[in-house]
Amino acid sequence: SYHGGLIGVVAAAWGCTRRQGVSLREAADLVVPAAPLGYTFGRIGNFINGELYGRVTASPIGMVFPLAPDRALRHPSQLYEALLEGVALFALLWSLRRRPFPRGAMLALYLVGYGTARFLVEFFREPDAHIGYTWAGLTRGQLLCAGMIAAGLILYRFLRRLPQSPPAGLRSPSPRRA
């Protein structure tokens, strides 16, 4: 559901920025670095609710989740996601935000960073019961994340080929004439 939601957010952002006469690439560069903080709190909420728990483990950090179908110790994968997709990705994007990247590069870097973090965490997360494992022992989430990583790399390569004008900054659009 996250991957579809991301497509919806990008489509809505494209529509809003276009309607307001604002550059989507500049808006993304401003907003995207802070977006991972939302995952941190969302995944902590998943942990508190005992949902989206991890795979069975013998690790000393394993926990029993009341909503799991058994009383086995499981990885607290929600916390792994909060740390990797949330805190670590935020720190990375925030530290890179003022570097001389092409306009819009934050979205490409986000796609690669989130896709990589989620792909790795999926090895510890219990797959959705109605989906299970798909191709080559990977979860659907991992396959979708591989697509995100590829899309991020392609987008970055595309952005590098565009002519780079100095950013105009986000400003109030001029009033439209009737």
Can you say where each PLM-predicted feature lies in the sequence?
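A feature for loop-to-transmembrane-helix boundaries and adjacent hydrophobic helices
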Residues: 1-178
